[in-house]
Amino acid sequence: MEYLNTAQELLDFIMRCKSPFHVVKEAGDLLNENGYTKLEETKEWSLVPGGKYYVTRNESSVIAFQIPESAFSSYQIIASHSDCPTFKVKGEDPFVTDGHYTRLNVEGYGGMIRSPWFDRPLSLAGRMVVRDGNSVKSVLVDAGRDLVTIPNLPIHLNRDINNGIKYSVQTDMLPILGDETAKDHFYELFLPDTAKEDILSMELYLYNRVEGSIWGASKEFLSSGRLDDLQSAFGSLKGFLAAKATGQVNVCAIFDNEEVGSLTKQGADSSFLTETLQHINAACGKDTIAYHRDLAGSFMVSADNAHAFHPAHAEKYDPKSRVYMNGGVVIKPVSYTHLTLPTIRLV
């Protein structure tokens, strides 16, 4: 069945996307395969009718767009995010040792349930900045194997564990890397051919090594880590690549740092989208008034996950607006308007 093929394609996509940098690399590969040209923010853009392009920022956010063959009068945008709730390695010397074990100093990144991170195979991925002659370059890295774990105390030493535990990241959740010698060859796990002194900085994130699965009596459900928001990033890319721009510029944006407020230079609250649309406007020979007119007629979908109804906790849900798995697209209208536009834009 076709939906099972698509579901497996999503799971495969998620397994390749182990950090925001890997998400943008994967998106770039898909765009390249479909005839898109990569642009640079620092260079002049030369766009043609029917052209397909994309631009990245910080290697962790990407905006792709299609120029229609004829004149356009609006932008049709779908946006998602590349980051996921996880743990981030802290600092350039993250090793915590006690003479027997080496642990990694980490901090929580984004909103998550902490308990599922215990007692399972975890690994690390992200990027490192290395010396390259008289310059520097960024290199994507992935340990690619079961590397660390966060062990629970045995129940004999923690009889209250099934009564509810408040976990401290700094006390309970520093992952064990290895014995006391582990820090001596840590960097070799990622860049075995690069001298330690040539590795200048790093951004590493934990990821769950357990693969996602399709389950249920009729294979109707799917489970995986990083569904928030790689599910939407995957669906947005698939829909965007299948669409054809006619009378409007189609735009697919995947932003970083949604999980921590979107306030970075590559976040959704940055200038990245606005400046990209301004670049498009100028490269297509349109003036500022035309840009504002086109913007006023544009439409944007912010694509993220929704929480489905939990049958064991009906009291937690609105009595009328309940979401069920496989029930279709969810629209979130709320009075404080953070999630949707006025009703007229939803019709």
What residues fall within each predicted segment?
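A glycine-rich helix N-cap at a beta->alpha junction
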Residues: L273-A296, M300
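Short glycine/threonine-rich loop-to-helix capping motif typified by GTGT followed
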Residues: G261-L273, N305-Y317
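Conserved small/polar residues in nucleotide/adenosyl-binding loops
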Residues: T337-T343
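N-terminal capping segment at the start of a domain
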Residues: M1-F21
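Alpha-helical metal-binding/catalytic segments enriched in His/Glu/Asp
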Residues: S223-G261
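Soluble metallo-hydrolase cores and metallopeptidase-like ectodomains found primarily
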Residues: N58-A64, E69-F72, R131, V141-S224, ...
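A generic, well-ordered mixed alpha/beta core segment in the N-terminal half of proteins
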Residues: S74-D160
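Acidic/His- and Gly-rich active-site-bordering loop/insert found
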Residues: K38, T42-V89
